[in-house]
Amino acid sequence: MGKSAVLELAEDLISRPSVTPEDAGCQELMIARLKAVGFRVTRLPANGVENFWAERGGAGPRLCFAGHTDVVPSGPLAEWQNDPFQPIIRDGMLYGRGAADMKGSLAAMVVAAERFVALHPAHSGRLAFLITSDEEGIATHGTRHVVDWLREHGETIDWCVVGEPSSEKVLGDVIKNGRRGSLNGRLTVHGIQGHVAYPDKADNPIHRAFRPLADLVDQSWDAGNDFFPPTRLQFSNIHAGTGANNVIPGQLQADFNFRFSTESTPESLQAGVHKILDASAMRYTIDWQLSGPPFFTAPGPLVAATQKALQAVEQRVAQLSTGGGTSDGRFIAQLGGQVVELGPVNATIHKINECVAVADLEHLAQIYMEIMVHLLETANGR
């Protein structure tokens, strides 16, 4: 028995070393397949990043499948059981960098579209793809760039399925129907450098920062809601000092991150931080960077179609979740449509010996096609 179309495409994509922001020819491979079944393709490169928008159909609601061709670095090659860019199958698992995050999903999307078009060549609505090579990196010139282009052209997306590896233990046990926002801050506490033997001639920023930093950690920012856990602040880096044990440092720098719910806004969190720090006696500055606001898709047509697809293929009812890190869904949601994430099991993503179950690839293609059928055909009375 030969390999399935999904497996063959997944292997071809994995074999291309597209370490972020490189694409290594992955998108041209996808574009050729999509053009062959009638998709109109617009390439949207930006600052060394490869992006494309592909669409089929002329009018009606738009269903988009989104994903990224870039992968994280492989890590130490000696620790891999195989070359990370020479995919192999072992014990029913496909191994290679990007197998789960997210070249397996990309292969499933493309094959699902091919099969859908073969069965429904005159389908209602519009079927689209939004693909980038800048998701694992700074994510500035990728999906965000394509979304800006769509907005400039007055285009919207009604429904979007992002192929991120959402599953926890088995395929389709979790659907991500939202993500928390992410806000970064770099706090600099300004002191006066001096000799530790003469503290009255210096101003120690470490001492100044102790209580305010503890107050930030202890602060309750919000209580969350039915769909999001409470907003949390975490410090990731703190640095002060020259390395010498007889020098009071002149400044302290602390990096922190908020993962925040829809109960908070970047503005409310910034105001809360400044209120706590202003109550202290220290001199400070903060540089803020918003990675993305939270987004949430309430149960509706897209969630229902995704659940029905999972029931049809996997006989499974998925848990809806907003947990985990950020994704490109945060940019797509700004166009006003419904967004979910559904993809393979995420147990090995970004790890040595990343892998995906071969059987799950075929099932995922079936699930994606069922979503297409439900939203573009069944829901429209076709």
Curated annotation (Swiss-Prot):
Reactions catalysed: N-succinyl-(2S,6S)-2,6-diaminopimelate + H2O = (2S,6S)-2,6-diaminopimelate + succinate
- Under Enzyme Commission nomenclature, its number is 3.5.1.18
**Cofactor: how bound:** Binds 2 Zn(2+) or Co(2+) ions per subunit.
Q: Does the keyword Zinc apply?
A: yes
What does the record give as its pathway?
Amino-acid biosynthesis; L-lysine biosynthesis via DAP pathway; LL-2,6-diaminopimelate from (S)-tetrahydrodipicolinate (succinylase route): step 3/3
Q: Which residues bind Zn(2+) 2?
A: D101, E136, H350
Q: Which residues bind Zn(2+) 1?
A: H68, D101, E164
Q: Please, one GO biological process term? A: diaminopimelate biosynthetic process
Pfam families, alphabetized: M20_dimer, Peptidase_M20
Q: Does the keyword Transcription apply?
A: no
Q: Which UniProt keywords apply?
A: Amino-acid biosynthesis, Cobalt, Diaminopimelate biosynthesis, Hydrolase, Lysine biosynthesis, Metal-binding, Zinc
Highest taxon of the source? Bacteria
State the needed cofactors, names only. Answer: Zn(2+); Co(2+)
Question: Active-site residues?
Answer: D70, E135 (proton acceptor)
Identify which top EC class this enzyme belongs to: hydrolase
Task: State any single GO MF term.
Answer: cobalt ion binding
The similarity annotation says:
Belongs to the peptidase M20A family. DapE subfamily.
The record, for HAMAP family, names: DapE (MF_01690)
**Self-association state and partner proteins as the record states:** Homodimer.
- What is known about what this protein does? Catalyzes the hydrolysis of N-succinyl-L,L-diaminopimelic acid (SDAP), forming succinate and LL-2,6-diaminopimelate (DAP), an intermediate involved in the bacterial biosynthesis of lysine and meso-diaminopimelic acid, an essential component of bacterial cell walls.
UniProt-recorded name of the protein: Succinyl-diaminopimelate desuccinylase
The gene is dapE
